[in-house]
Amino acid sequence: ELRLMAHISGDEAMIDAFLSGEDFHRATAAKIYHLPLPDVTDSQRRAAKTANFGIIYGISAFGLSERLGIPRGEAKELIEGYLRTYPGVKQYMDDAIEKARHDEAVSTVMGRRRMLPDINSRNAVVRGYAERNAINAPLQGSAADIIKKAMIAIAHRLESEHFESKMILQVHDELVVDVVPSELERLKAMVVEEM
């Protein structure tokens, strides 16, 4: 979902962080805390990871402070630092909410729509929930679309190429395969091609 955020938001700093091949959460921590990458502590990396996922799910400073066990003011600074680091993410969030207000719906990269009839609600709690969905549903929905497309392609190849290995489970962005040991290398190459 973070890679999708980079793609959909077009945020250059986020795209560059992924293209560099470095640990994205550590790279985010280095930017937020203004540190050289090797100086980022494991604790700072964990905080950045929580921020990376939490912010795209619409976490508040209160929620982030609770998750990380830090003061609310520090969590607020972390969120603000994140949004300064990745300004395209903030722009995407604002644009997604505005477009959803107009359309009362959002779409995945493959065109699947999620209706958001409460996006213009007068009730702030109800509206806030719809706004968070306006930001997150295109990301989570697109990730779901992409993994399902990969699963279909892999299932076809498992059958057409006469693998004995079986795809048995999907968990978020991972596929679990019961692998026949003699097929491991060929299967790994095929899965990489399809994903």
Regions found by a protein language model. Name each.
Residues 1-195:
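Conserved catalytic core of nucleotide polymerization and phosphodiester-bond processing enzymes
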